[in-house]
């Protein structure tokens, strides 16, 4: 029974630690995600206006069709990932997934913008680029949030490890009580 009490005290001290002040609040994260999603939603209708099959018929590489399809899928994945992160902003995996989805979309979108500029309409390409550029600030904020969240999680693990070591030491130093 005594060992259980010591273990409970150790766990309570670990979970009673205050979070690092470097990580954005949940409200700030949700606000940033709402802005990110609003900008991303603007891309969908513009991507729908693109006709990469026509580009290919006019001599463009067939890869543009694949990249356009990939960009549309990545846009959907980004929305889903951002929704998941908004529901659980403390989840490092969700934050990383959202950041990686955003980077993948930006990478693919760059090629689609180039194709749009060359084979369809430079004004549409400029519009896509402007909307994607408006999300650069959100991408930077998300990246900083991921870094801060990872540092916080690493600190929490260090505290838990130190407390576990202290508890093990405390338990191993106790003398066994004889039976009465």
Where are these regions (language model features)?
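Sec-dependent N-terminal signal peptides
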Residues: 3-13
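A near-ubiquitous, low-amplitude feature marking generic local secondary-structure context
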Residues: 6, 19, 23-26, 30, ...
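Boundary at the C-terminal end of the N-terminal hydrophobic targeting segment
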Residues: 14-18
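C-terminal amphipathic alpha-helix
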Residues: 21-54, 116-180
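Alpha-helical segments in soluble extracytoplasmic regions
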Residues: 36-103, 108
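Surface-exposed, polar helix/loop patches in the mature regions of secreted/periplasmic/lumenal proteins
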Residues: 83-139
